[in-house]
Every structure is written in C-alpha cells, then in structure tokens.
Amino acid sequence: MDKRDAVLGAIWSAPELIRDFQALCDTGGRFCGTESEAIARDFLRERLAEIPGIGRGEYVFDYEVWGRKTNRVTVLGKGEKTLPCHALIWSKDTPPGGLEGEVVDLGRGHRADFESAGELIRGRIALVRQDYPFGADTVHRMMKYRWAREFGAAGYLLAYPAPGQLVATGYCALNIPEDIPAAGLAYEGAALLGRRPDGSLARARIEVEGERRTEKSVNLIAEIPGKGPEWVSLTAHYDGHDLAESALDNATGAAAILQILRTLAPLVPDCERGLRVSFYTTEEWGLLGSYRYVNDLTEAERRAIAVNVNLDTIAGSPNLACLTSGYVELEDWVRGVGAEIGQGFRIIRPPKRNSDHYNYARRGIPAMRLVAGFDEPDSRVGLILTPADTRDKAPVGELKNGTVAAAAFVWKALNQPGPVVPHKTDEEAAELVAGLE
C-alpha cells in the first residue's frame, strides 16, 4: 500500500469524522451572530488545539449582524390566514402595520418570467419558487430578488418548490436603501397566493422587522508548512441557517476538513507544499468571510496558493461534482485524480458564485468546489436551506466518500512537482467573473 492509499484508508476508517459531524450538528443551525455559531466556533478551536504540529490563527473582522424580530406573512381576504415563513437575510423592514399588496405569481422566477409579467409587477409583491440549488440552469434567489427590484416590486416572496411544509430561507438583500421586504415560504403557502380562479390577484401582508448591530466575526485558520513556499488551501464554512442543523450545508464540509487536517498533519512537512485550512463564517451572508480574507492577502500571498479546494455540501447524494470556476486546466487535473483513486467526478466549468471558492477564483487563484448532487433535484441536497437539513440526510458512507475524495485532491496538490495549474492575471480573473459581481 502506498502512502496515499494509507492516508485515504485512515480517513475512511476514522471515527472522529462522524463524531465531529454529529457534534457540529448538535450546535444547531449556526446562524451568524447567534450563540449557536459561537458554540460551533469554540468547538472547532478545541479540535484544532488537539492536533499537534499545526500553527493556528484567527482572522477577525467587523460586520453588521442582522436578526429577525418580526416575521409574518398573511393571506388577506376571506379566511385570512397567517403562513409559515422566514424573513430572508437583510430583508428591508416593513412599515408599521406591514406591507400589503397584490401578489404576482412568477412561477420559477427566471428572467423570462419577469419580462413576461412586465409592468404588472410594479408596486406589487413578486412570488417566485426557489430553484434546486445546484444545476446547470439554476438561477440563484439573489438574481430573482434583483429582478424583482428592477421591475419595481414592492416585496419579494421565495417559496420552496415542492410539498412538505418546508419553508425556504437564505440571503438575498444587500443591506442598502433600495432593498425591499423579503420572506421565504413553503410550497403550500405559495399555493394560497396564486392567481384566483376568476383571474384576480391574491393579496398578502408582509411584516418584517430586523435588528442590526455591529459585531466581530472570526475565520479560523490552521497551517502546516511544507518543504516549499507554496500552499494548498482547503476551505469550508461553518456558519449556517437557523431552521435546522445545517447538516449538509455545511457540517459535512467542516467535519471533513478537520479529519483531513488531523490525518495529514504529521505528513505535510515532507510534502512539496504546505497545507492551510480555513474555516469561514458569514458564507451564508454573501460569502463575506472569505471575501474579506482573500482580499486582504497580498499579491505575493495569493500567488503562493497553488490551488483552493473548497468543501461545501459533500453529502446528500453519492455523486460528486467539481465546480472548476472556469479554470480549464483544473479539469484535466480533476480527471487525473479521479482516475488514480477510481472515482469519477462530474466537472462543471462555468464560474459559480455559490460558495467560498468563488472568492479565490475571482482573484486569480485556481479554485474548485466539491459538491454532492449536482443536477439531481430529487436528491437530499435539495433540502438545504430548509427545516429538513438535518444529520439524517447525510449517510455515513456519503460523508466518508466525500471526505476521502477531497483528501485525494489535497494529497495530489501537496505532492505534485511543479505548478498544479496556472494562475490568472487580474484582468483574466475579472473577465472570468464578469456578470457575477
């Protein structure tokens, strides 16, 4: 057995992987600015302190915390009914008494749906469905929200697309004066807000009040130098949403990189490159934590990162995909690692602004995201950002499989002579992400 196979075997059989995953789920949803997030951060600190031979640091930054005080959507008219809902992060507060208006049901809420409705949207409440989060034709809820604002909507409702009383949540507003009130609904709530049989529009009242305060947030960093000056960056976010346990998204990724670091720690000093692990927070708030961190790196520090491997939602389906961020050379590298370990990966080339790898790619650093269930809308991955994102959705075998696959990429990058893949210039990177900023 060669050293790589021994490493992967040790990770597969490590009981600490499942222990850490369960412990992270025990902390709750880890919504930023809450006790749940703080408990998770302290847990990760404790686990990192147990690993010998690593350097530990913290990247501390100020940000404005937002929390929900009032959170209500009501169907108006005969048989008035209050619906299960969840205000979306940074929703604008409604005026006293709430925002009342007619509801325009835009179906999936893709650009063509907005253009078809046109002026009907102005001054009314736009209702759209949440897309399956990872697919070739996925439109992010933030784009739908921006279109709602562009077409003059007074409010925005995002509904989960399938039955089950699963309320949708997520980040969409920008904390700017142009924001509009926004809330997530369940499929069943949206069904009550569709166009009436006589062709009239349903009416609803949105009531949202948030609380805002400035706090400090913390990215946790751990690193082990290798023989050379370059680094392999391994990242995952530990924050989440407060509807459930944020198990798939992203206790899976955080537990995985803990185990990879634990297993590789004694081996990295003999590798060509060092290993730097980052546990990011505020990922669910527009990728803020990694944005701040990567932007604060010097040009030399960014050029010293050979590749970023980002783990986010690595269970929920047995099938794994690599989002290669438009770095075409990464595709052959991914295929090569897959061939070495006997595992196929679906490769998705277009840049995706859906996790922390994006902030590396936009600064010229080759970056990939490992994710389960791409283009599998019937998989358990579709339950992220809902009350059903709980630990039972991540079978042990899938979590182990995702962790071992990630470790294979990291091991290859640590030991590969010469560049992993070329970096991009600032101009090339800007062109790559044009339209996503």
Regions flagged by a language model, labelled:
Residues 190, 227-229, 242, 280-381:
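Metal-dependent peptidase/peptidase-like ectodomains
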Residues 76-78, 82-115, 171-247, 259-274:
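Soluble metallo-hydrolase cores and metallopeptidase-like ectodomains found primarily
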Residues 262, 266, 273, 377-437:
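His/Asp/Glu-rich mid-to-C-terminal helical/loop segments that flank catalytic regions of hydrolases
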Residues 12-36, 45-54, 120, 124-131, ...:
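Catalytic-core environment of secreted peptidases
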Residues 4-11, 26-35, 105, 130-139, ...:
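Second-shell loop/turn segments in exported
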Residues 23, 57, 105, 125-129, ...:
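Structural recognition of the beta-strand scaffold that forms the well-ordered cores
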Residues 2-35, 166-172, 176, 239, ...:
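N-terminal capping segment at the start of a domain
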Residues 14, 19-125, 132:
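Noncatalytic luminal/extracellular "stalk/propeptide" segments of secretory-pathway proteins
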